[in-house]
A protein has these predicted regions:
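Ubiquitin-like/PB1-type beta-grasp interaction modules and other compact soluble beta-rich domains
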Residues: 1-79
């Protein structure tokens, strides 16, 4: 599956996206654990629950079961005026 990063998350990962094997993770929660291992700086943002996850362009809950063809996007909080 493809994981896409946006805004300052790209600065943490130093890339726009990753390709992750579907055998693990199987849910968004498991994906977060996997990403924490790859990018330890993300952990504090996951703990603060400030990042939003979209699967195939729809926001989802953390217990959603993922499929190999899914595209996951991770968004930081949005502000504006």
């Amino acid at each position: 599956m493809r994981i896409r990063y946006f805004a300052w998350i790209k600065d943490i990962t130093n890339k726009d996206d990753d390709i992750i094997d579907i055998n693990h993770p199987k849910t968004i929660e498991e994906l977060k654990q996997n990403l924490e291992n790859l990018y330890p700086e993300l952990k504090k943002h996951f703990l603060q629950d400030v990042l939003r996850f979209a699967v195939n362009q729809e926001y989802v809950s953390e217990n959603l079961k993922l499929k190999p063809i899914d595209e996951i996007a991770i968004f930081p909080p949005v502000s504006g005026g």
